[in-house]
């Protein structure tokens, strides 16, 4: 079975960079650990066997908008037939917004 390509939206890249930069203000080591763990989990989304929950904050979600949480961060992604799009990354303490 072919693996899906993982693509980040510009918004998700910006959010992720801000998160890592914020953590780096206190600890380079913690920033690197968190960055590596999140990236590792995201890279595994290309595997078809990975199943996460449907994103309840997506309006009219046909089931292709999914999410998972890791290290108090909520990652939302869209899963198409050939590709996974990373949509957003937010800390779980932030109020989720419908989109």
Regions found by a protein language model. Give the residues of each.
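Short acidic/glycine-enriched loop/turn segments that link adjacent beta-strands
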Residues: 61-64, 72
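Basic, Lys/Arg-enriched alpha-helical interface segments
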Residues: 1-62
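Enriched for short, Lys/Arg-rich terminal
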Residues: 70-99
């Amino acid at each position: 079975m072919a693996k899906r390509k993982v693509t980040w939206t510009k918004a998700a890249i910006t959010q992720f960079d801000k998160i890592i930069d914020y953590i780096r203000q206190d600890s380079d080591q913690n920033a690197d650990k968190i960055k590596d763990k999140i990236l590792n989990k995201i890279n595994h989304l290309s595997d078809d066997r990975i199943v996460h929950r449907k994103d309840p904050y997506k309006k009219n979600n046909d089931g292709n908008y999914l999410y998972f949480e890791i290290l108090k961060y909520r990652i939302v992604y869209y899963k198409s037939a050939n590709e996974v799009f990373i949509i957003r990354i937010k800390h779980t303490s932030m109020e989720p917004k419908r989109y």
